[in-house]
Amino acid sequence: MSEQRQNPEQEVELNEDLAKMEADVEAAVQAAEEHAEQEQSPEAEIAMLYAELEVAKQTIADQKDGVVRAAADVENMRRRAAQDVEKAHKFALEKFANELLPVIDNLERAIEFSDKENETLKPVLEGISMTVKSFNDAVAKFGVEIVNPQGEQFNPEFHQAMSIQPSNDVSPNTVLAVMQKGYTLNGRLLRPAMVMVSKAADA
């Protein structure tokens, strides 16, 4: 029995089927190759994750450092502002005290050089004395203190020697007399006390 020959239409159809199968195989092979290229080994994936983790850590560290610097800047600004306010307050108080000291000096001189035996002047002197005390009490509330070193050792930080007097009654460098009181403001010198200082008498 002789082989049955295919008609031309069947041959065309068979060729088309073969071509389609070849195309499908090529597509499958290409897809497999692309997938293989995209796939990474577990070691490579772990290495990539570690790299991403390090980047994330560095980002967090940078952000934390920025927050710390910003907080430090804010604290420095707050401290400087507080210092500026304190300096302004002290400067205003110092200026006020320096303006007031000559007034107190004049009132004290009025008492010192007045005729204390004059009965007519006694009420006036008492009033002036009360005024001086009120002034001193008022400024003391703001940290102003009197420097009246009568009988104390001379201290060049708070005293200004106007004259030196020989004396056998006290040790050398003792304040014999206070010509003008000094004042401090919160421990800082406003005005030195003007004094007479002793020295050893000649033998």
Swiss-Prot record:
SUPFAM superfamilies to which the protein is assigned, alphabetical = Coiled-coil domain of nucleotide exchange factor GrpE (SSF58014), Head domain of nucleotide exchange factor GrpE (SSF51064)
From which residue to which does any coiled coil extend?
Answer: none
One GO cellular component term, please give it: cytosol
Q: Where, per UniProt, does this protein localize?
A: Cytoplasm
Kindly list the residue ranges recorded as spanning the membrane: none
Q: Does the keyword tRNA-binding apply?
A: no
This protein's assembly is summarised as: Homodimer.
The UniProt entry's sequence similarity note says:
Belongs to the GrpE family.
Functionally, this protein is described as follows: Participates actively in the response to hyperosmotic and heat shock by preventing the aggregation of stress-denatured proteins, in association with DnaK and GrpE. It is the nucleotide exchange factor for DnaK and may function as a thermosensor. Unfolded proteins bind initially to DnaJ; upon interaction with the DnaJ-bound protein, DnaK hydrolyzes its bound ATP, resulting in the formation of a stable complex. GrpE releases ADP from DnaK; ATP binding to DnaK triggers the release of the substrate protein, thus completing the reaction cycle.
What is this protein identified as? Protein GrpE
